[in-house]
């Protein structure tokens, strides 16, 4: 059961990362893709560190 939850959580985080980066790419299409994320490009970009911290807090 714990493995299933871990797999689903990992897939959820991967999807959030994919859609977050897609939104950032749409917001700043001229950005260098190898330069890394630009926090100024999309103010509503998903904060993965906050999501990870919340998940650790909830799952223990």
UniProtKB/Swiss-Prot annotation:
It is found in: Secreted. Residues 1-27 form the signal peptide. It comes from the Eukaryota. Belongs to the MCD family. Mastoparan subfamily. AXPX repeats lie at residues 27-30, 31-34, 35-38, 41-44. GO terms for cellular component: extracellular region. The keyword Plastid does not apply. Residues 28-45 form a propeptide. The synthetic peptide shows antimicrobial activities against Gram-negative bacteria (but not against all strains tested), Gram-positive bacteria (all strains tested) and the fungi C.albicans and C.parapsilosis. Exhibits moderate hemolytic activity (25% at 100 ug/ml) against washed human erythrocytes. The modification Leucine amide is found at residue 59. Expressed by the venom gland. GO terms for biological process: defense response to bacterium; defense response to fungus; innate immune response; killing of cells of another organism. It comes from Vespa tropica (Greater banded hornet). The keyword Signal applies. Keywords: Amidation, Antibiotic, Antimicrobial, Fungicide, Immunity, Innate immunity, Repeat, Secreted, Signal. This is Mastoparan-VT3.
């Amino acid at each position: 059961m714990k493995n299933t939850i871990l797999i689903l959580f990992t897939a959820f985080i991967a999807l959030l990362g994919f859609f977050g980066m897609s939104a950032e790419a749409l917001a700043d299409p001229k950005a260098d893709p190898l330069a890394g994320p630009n926090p100024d490009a999309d103010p509503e970009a998903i904060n993965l560190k906050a999501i990870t911290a919340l998940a650790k807090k909830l799952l223990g």
